[in-house]
Amino acid sequence: MARAVGIDLGTTNSVVSVLEGGEPTVIANAEGGRTTPSVVAFAKNGEVLVGEIAKRQAVTNIDRTVRSVKREVGTNWSTTIDDKKYTPQEISARVLQKLKRDAESYLGEAVTDAVITVPAYFNDAQRQATKEAGEIAGLNVLRIINEPTAAALAYGLEKGKEDELILVFDLGGGTFDVSLLEVGKDEDGFSTIQVRATSGDNHLGGDDWDQRVVDHLLKKVSSAYGIDLSKDKIAMQRLRESAEQAKKELSTATSTGISLQYLSMSENGPVHLDETLTRAQFEQMTQDLLDRTKKPFHDVIRDADVKLADIHHVVLVGGSTRMPAVTGVVKELLGGKEPNKGVNPDEVVAIGAALQAGVLKGERKDVLLIDVTPLSLGIETKGGIMTKLIERNTAIPTKRSEVFTTADDNQPSVLIQVFQGERELARDNKPLGTFELTGIAPAPRGVPQVEVTFDIDANGIVHVNAKDRGTGKEQSMTISGGSALSKEDIERMVKDAEQHANEDKQRREEAEARNQAEGLVYQTEKFVADNSDKLPEDGKAEVQAAVAELKTALAGTDAAEIKAKSDAVAQASQKLGAAMYAAQAEGGAAGDAGAQAGPDFTKPSASDEDVVDAEVVDDEKDK
């Protein structure tokens, strides 16, 4: 049975985890890191770079490097590189492919199934796009689950008490969520984790804190040199990297230095930046971002109808929660209660996803997870009103139906427009899709009965059905938002991703063949040089000719030619080595003959023949 993994597909970093003997383990990537930067780069030679290696080359390849694409998931955003358009799903799929590859390398077997996490406040289009990214990467997405829910799953299973409330404060690289969950455990150790309420902001995260530092540095350069660097892509990339590093350093230090030499050129010469940024300055310039975390927190407490004193545990999730100001605001919101710092904020979500994967695959049978839909779902009715069929924070999966009628006499069809959100007017909410139910029998307005059914599956993805009770005609659709990919698009992208995987494998094999060939040249030349006086001339000439041909092949790019010439050098070297040892053996035999004739030679005595260098004794037999 193929293994299932849990994946935290993050804005800035991603993590993959797997159950080993029923317990979750975070898998280190090929570079040795436990988190993989969610960065994809397209090298000019056609190679696709993912993770740390893509992040490191961003300064010199900025136009061909994509980062923080999670913020664009579920939208019509795309980027064009080498005349090819890439969607957020395709870029995300590259990251997922790397995580899949690293997991397979660690496990030594194929990985086909995955549970992928998304921010709790992701809408339907964003969830659908994430699922599509998994499919493009060659994964069977068992479930899409909310990040705070996964974190609570990882944290809550360790708790022994019944009916505890856990608040998860999740501030990542690009998104923010607050969720309140109830964790119960019965006498048999079976855990039930139920989401009580969730809220958030899909465009609030560590990237925004970084941008404030970048803006601050741009002003400093402008006032010192009178130039605007915001259009200088390379300078902006260097500023972004320095801003991110400064943010991290200010989590432990009260001030940090930012030094960027030769950042750009001005009329008066090179532009250098040497700045000191204090934690107080940093917190002042980002205070409004911090304030934006407060409303979702209060919304969750209100929706769940609980008192702050009822909350047993507070879990911080996401690398951005390491900032002291964030920890401070959480403590302030909780009336002085200290958040729990016993979990790794970068890894806890992936660990929860791996646990859920284990539940779905039958590896863990001691937990039930009940999630909720983060936003209300409804349709537009007369007057542009948003008529809700499923309210936010409803447990999923769920199914709701309601009967509507026509607005005009003899109306032959109705247009079903589906929206997601909390506003009273449909136009102020997120449009998810539109479809038409036709063939309604002629009748006065108000007479036909059209039953509209909303069905939200365990992934939080919406399915809608409309049925005319009079004629029995019905129309269905799976809502997938404006960014949705057709089945043909997904299949094409899957093939494209597989092709790139094969190309990457071929490149690795070519690089290995080249490395082995270069090593073979070095070893062979060293062997010939070290043993020149002991080697036959004809054998030396053959090896040197083979090495020369291999060097010529290495100057080119034909991997098959390099391998063939390497084999020729190896064979010639083996022959030469055999000839050298044969010559030494002959010389040794002649020496033995001379020694036997000499006066000092004595035959071994009978006792000498019985001498052995060492003997293994089995003590057990003697006992």
UniProtKB/Swiss-Prot annotation:
Acts as a chaperone. InterPro entries: ATPase_NBD, Chaperone_DnaK, Heat_shock_70_CS, HSP70_C_sf, HSP70_peptide-bd_sf, Hsp_70_fam. The keyword Chaperone applies. Induction: By stress conditions e.g. heat shock. The keyword Nucleotide-binding applies. It comes from the Bacteria. This is Chaperone protein DnaK. Pfam families: HSP70. Residues 496-524, 583-623 are annotated as: Disordered. It comes from Kineococcus radiotolerans (strain ATCC BAA-149 / DSM 14245 / SRS30216). Residues 583-598 have a biased composition (Low complexity). Keywords: ATP-binding, Chaperone, Nucleotide-binding, Phosphoprotein, Stress response. The modification Phosphothreonine is found at T175. NCBIfam families: PRK00290.1, prok_dnaK. Residues 496-515 have a biased composition (Basic and acidic residues). GO terms for molecular function: ATP binding; ATP-dependent protein folding chaperone; unfolded protein binding. Residues 607-623 have a biased composition (Acidic residues). Belongs to the heat shock protein 70 family.
